[in-house]
């Protein structure tokens, strides 16, 4: 089967952080999320990177391709998804592991170097959602992981 060819991004001005909206007990990765997205009619996983519970960073959609993760921003952004983000009742919860948060920080530092001037954003900054279930700015600046239900 031929690999799908996606349009390349012409610019990268945002780096969006998402969560998979899964419970802490679910350790899913790019394979499962790709399947979920395909079941919604998408051609591939919408995120460029997935960070598993153990901190493993998995490549999703080609990094230079237009993603499918934030309506209105896909053509100018990279999408990073942390596995987790909801509690047993389905409410937002910053239940990410220390390994995930360390991997996220390292990846974001790399991406900020690669895409000079790109702004770090949470999905809830531009959509009425809780995603990624924590205050990204506070975590980035103060290293404090606090649940947030913006949206």
Swiss-Prot record:
The record's free-text note on cofactor binding: Zn(2+) is required for amidase activity.
GO BP: defense response to bacterium; negative regulation of viral transcription; peptidoglycan catabolic process; viral release from host cell by cytolysis
pH dependence: Optimum pH is 7.
Cellular component per GO, a single term: host cell cytoplasm
Keyword Methyltransferase among record annotations: no
Reaction equations catalysed: Hydrolyzes the link between N-acetylmuramoyl residues and L-amino acid residues in certain cell-wall glycopeptides
Keywords: Antimicrobial, Bacteriolytic enzyme, Cytolysis, Host cell lysis by virus, Host cytoplasm, Hydrolase, Late protein, Metal-binding, Viral release from host cell, Zinc
Activity regulation: Binding to the viral RNA polymerase inhibits amidase activity.
CDD domains recorded: PGRP (cd06583)
InterPro entries documented for this protein: Amidase/PGRP_sf, Amidase_domain, Endolysin_T7_type, PGRP, PGRP_domain_met/bac
Domain of life: Viruses
Disulfide bonds: none
Required cofactor names: Zn(2+)
Family in the record: Belongs to the N-acetylmuramoyl-L-alanine amidase 2 family.
HAMAP family: ENDOLYSIN_T7
Subunit relationships: Interacts with the viral RNA polymerase.
Protein name in the entry: Endolysin
Organism encoding this protein: Klebsiella phage KP32
Upper classification of the organism: Viruses, Duplodnaviria, Heunggongvirae, Uroviricota, Caudoviricetes
